[in-house]
UniProtKB/Swiss-Prot annotation:
Its cofactor is a divalent metal cation. This is RNA pyrophosphohydrolase. Residues 6-149 form the Nudix hydrolase domain. Transmembrane segments: none annotated. It comes from Dechloromonas aromatica (strain RCB). InterPro entries: Nudix_hydrolase (IPR020476), NUDIX_hydrolase-like_dom_sf (IPR015797), NUDIX_hydrolase_CS (IPR020084), NUDIX_hydrolase_dom (IPR000086), RppH (IPR022927). Pfam families: NUDIX (PF00293).
Length: 182
């Protein structure tokens, strides 16, 4: 389902723990990390799609989280042509997303990357909210930054601090701290 401009409606999920660290999932058989996200099906509201995607990708149910906020409008990114399926070229531009900020009220052990038979991630970890976005595929970085900046107002942070810390090495300790489903 594409809109008139060629964007697929989608939801993005920033899941925080009690320390305001964010959930990052490692794409299966890739070394790229991302927030959970997915398409909005015909007839679904963004919130319904968010809860469906949260379960499909992270295995969490509505009772495991609390919605803290969402973006006011759609955030868009274009997908480079070489990433677009041949049959979609010419009509598909990219994704437009409503982003949700969630607080995990359950336990880390509630995360189940194999809740469905088509897992999206093979590992996950908590990261600092302002971790550099170098490990995110390049064409999504600006939308991630926009979502993080817009939604931070719902968290208790020192608002005078930098938006993105450049000095921190992204995912440098991933081998030691990846939590994967065995």
């Amino acid at each position: 389902m594409l809109d008139r401009e060629g964007y697929r409606p989608n939801v993005g999920i920033i899941l925080c723990n009690g320390r305001n660290e964010v959930f990052w999932g490692k794409r299966i058989r890739e070394h790229s990390w991302q927030f959970p996200q997915g398409g909005i099906k015909r007839g679904e509201t963004p919130e319904e799609a968010m809860f469906r995607e949260l379960y499909e990708e992270v295995g969490l149910l509505p009772e495991h989280v609390r919605i803290l906020g969402r973006t006011k409008g759609w955030l868009r990114y274009e997908v480079p042509t070489h990433w677009i399926k041949r049959e979609w070229r010419g009509s598909y531009k990219g994704q437009k997303q409503i982003w949700f900020l969630l607080r995990l009220v359950g336990r880390d052990s509630d995360v189940n990357l194999r809740a469905t038979n088509k897992p999206e991630f093979d590992a996950w970890r908590w990261n600092d909210y302002w971790v550099p976005l170098d490990a995110v595929i390049e064409f999504k970085r600006l939308v991630y930054e926009q979502a993080l900046n817009e939604l931070v107002r719902f968290l208790d942070f020192d608002r005078k601090g930098p938006r993105h810390k450049k000095e921190q090495e992204p995912f440098s300790d991933v081998v030691d701290s990846v939590r994967s489903e065995e």
